[in-house]
Curated annotation (Swiss-Prot):
Domain of life: Bacteria
Name of the protein in its database record: Phosphoribosyl-AMP cyclohydrolase
GO biological process: L-histidine biosynthetic process
Similarity comment: Belongs to the PRA-CH family.
Lineage, opening ranks: Bacteria, Bacillati, Actinomycetota, Actinomycetes, Micrococcales
GO molecular function per UniProt: magnesium ion binding; phosphoribosyl-AMP cyclohydrolase activity; zinc ion binding
Pfam families: PRA-CH
Length: 138
C-alpha cells in the first residue's frame, strides 16, 4: 500500500553516492548511511516526547521531509517512497529534524494526527514491553 505515487523511486544505494544529492552539502556529508544508503529515522511527538515509530530515509526522503512539512520515508521492502498519512489520513506534520552525534540516526519531531502505527495504535511501541531488571541510582 503505497502512500505516495510520484515520482518513481530511485534506489537508495544510488542516492548515497550521488554528488547531486538533493540535500545541502553539509547535511549530505554528515549522514552515515547503511549499506543500502539509508539512515534510521526515529519519529517523536513534539509536545509529549512520545516515541511513535522508526522508519528509514535516504537523501531524497529526507529532502522531501525537510522541504514539504510532511514526513516521507523510504520503504525497504517495497523500495519506494511513501508519505505518512496519504492513504490513512494519519499525517505527520514536521516540527524539527535533528541528526544524532554519530550521524547515523535522525530524530524527526512531528505533530501526529491519528495513529502512527500501521496496526492502528498511537505508537508502534504499544504493549510489547519486555520484562527487565531495572537499574537504580546509588
Amino acid at each position: 500500500m503505497s502512500e505516495q505515487s510520484a515520482p518513481s523511486p530511485t534506489p537508495a544505494a544510488e542516492l548515497s553516492s550521488d554528488p547531486a544529492s538533493p540535500l545541502p552539502q553539509e547535511i549530505a556529508s554528515a549522514l552515515k548511511r547503511d549499506s543500502s544508503g539509508l539512515v534510521a529515522a526515529i519519529v517523536q511527538q513534539h509536545d509529549t516526547n512520545e516515541v511513535l515509530m522508526l522508519g528509514w530515509m535516504d537523501d531524497e526522503a529526507l529532502h522531501r521531509t525537510m522541504t514539504s512539512g510532511r514526513v516521507t520515508f523510504y520503504s525497504r521492502s517495497r523500495q519506494e517512497y511513501w508519505r505518512k498519512g496519504d492513504t490513512s489520513g494519519h499525517v505527520q506534520f514536521v516540527k524539527s529534524v535533528a541528526l544524532d552525534c554519530d550521524g547515523d540516526a535522525l530524530l524527526i519531531r512531528v505533530d501526529q494526527i491519528g495513529a502512527a502505527c500501521h496496526t492502528g495504535t498511537r505508537t508502534c511501541f504499544d504493549g510489547r514491553d519486555f520484562t527487565v531488571v531495572t537499574g537504580h541510582r546509588e
